[in-house]
């Protein structure tokens, strides 16, 4: 568990570090998806894509070959993913599993950093609100 850095300057510094780490992780996600697409010829039963979702979270996910513009995703650990894997030849299955593990690692790394980044930003915002009350109380005297 990460402790809150002492001092708001250190919190801001940690936020900047987290931002840089998140950018690096997203680059690694994009490289992983590109490597897969360069290593395998179409059509793929599924391929990794980087997806940005609300709230700033970014994931690399398996996109199934869609029809009519639909973009369905699959998790290799769920039932549909297991069916997909079981239909692949063993060497290809092993490659999909290897990519899947790398994707899981990148996704959890990004999610943990994004969660910490979000909480630290909220911490600074909450401190600013409380500072406003502290300064208002000091300038108006103690009315309590």
Which residue stretches match the model-derived regions?
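Conserved glycine(s) in the ABC-transporter nucleotide-binding domain "signature"
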Residues: 1-144
């Amino acid at each position: 568990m990460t402790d809150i850095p002492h001092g708001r300057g250190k919190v801001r510094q940690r936020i900047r570090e987290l931002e840089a780490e998140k950018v690096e992780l997203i680059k690694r996600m994009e490289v992983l998806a590109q490597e897969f697409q360069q290593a395998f010829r179409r059509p793929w039963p599924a391929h990794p894509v980087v997806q940005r979702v609300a709230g700033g979270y970014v994931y690399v996910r398996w996109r199934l070959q869609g029809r009519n513009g639909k973009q369905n995703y699959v998790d290799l650990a769920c039932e549909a993913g297991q069916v997909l894997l079981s239909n692949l030849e063993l060497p290809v299955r092993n490659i999909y599993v290897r990519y899947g593990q790398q994707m899981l690692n990148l996704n959890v790394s990004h999610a943990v950093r994004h969660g910490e980044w979000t909480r630290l930003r909220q911490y600074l915002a909450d401190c600013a609100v409380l500072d406003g009350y502290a300064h208002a109380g000091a300038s108006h005297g103690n009315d309590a």
